[in-house]
């Protein structure tokens, strides 16, 4: 009885082994066929992020791709435009800026340049950009200190009177 039970178990294990080997081979063929279909699809090309309201914050972008066997050729995706980015260079482009330069007395402007730090979703961005802004009022700390001294002097005079 034990001998028959052992043979039965051995036959069962051999049968399971054969089924497992055949099952993995057919599964590999199906997976390879699926990979071929996926490679027929082109890369996703994304539009710029369009804010839902205003010029920054949450929004959407549209993606398209080509391919005869692609099930999906257009899709929409949520996106976000940070509100602190310089949008004049494109909301998809992030720059690292230098310090502001000295004021140009001829133009009344000061400038600084920025180099491209990051481009989101394969956006086309300029490598370097330049910003200009009007020079602010030049404060003279010595004048402010002298005004304080005058006030202190007047206060002392009032106390003496």
From Swiss-Prot:
Gene3D superfamilies: Heparin-binding Growth Factor, Midkine, Chain A- C-terminal Domain (2.30.90.10), Pleiotrophin/Midkine, N-terminal domain (2.20.60.10). Residues 86-93, 117-125 are annotated as: Chondroitin sulfate binding. Residues 136-161 are annotated as: Disordered. Residues 141-161 are annotated as: Chondroitin sulfate A binding. Its main location: secreted. InterPro entries: Midkine_heparin-bd_GF, PTN/MK_C_dom, PTN/MK_C_dom_sf, PTN/MK_diS_sf, PTN/MK_N_dom, PTN/MK_N_dom_sf, PTN_MK_heparin-bd_GF_CS. GO terms for biological process: defense response to bacterium; positive regulation of cell division; positive regulation of cell population proliferation; response to bacterium. Disulfide bonds join 41-70, 49-79, 56-83, 93-125, 103-135. Residues 1-23 form the signal peptide. This is Pleiotrophin-A. The gene is ptn-a.
């Amino acid at each position: 009885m034990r001998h028959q039970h052992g043979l039965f178990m051995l036959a069962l294990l051999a049968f399971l082994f054969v089924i497992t080997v055949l099952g993995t081979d057919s599964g590999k063929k199906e997976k390879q066929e699926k990979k071929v279909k996926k490679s027929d699809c082109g890369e996703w090309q994304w539009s710029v992020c369009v804010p839902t309201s205003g010029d920054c914050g949450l929004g959407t972008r549209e993606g398209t791709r080509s391919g005869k066997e692609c099930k999906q050729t257009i899709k929409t995706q949520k996106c976000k435009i940070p509100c602190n980015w310089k949008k004049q260079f494109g909301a998809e482009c992030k720059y690292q800026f230098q310090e502001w330069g000295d004021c140009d007395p001829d133009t009344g402007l000061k400038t600084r340049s920025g180099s491209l730090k990051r481009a989101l979703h394969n956006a086309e961005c300029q490598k370097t950009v330049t910003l200009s802004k009007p020079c602010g009022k030049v404060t003279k700390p010595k004048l402010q200190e002298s005004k304080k001294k005058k006030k202190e002097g007047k206060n002392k005079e009032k106390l003496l009177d």
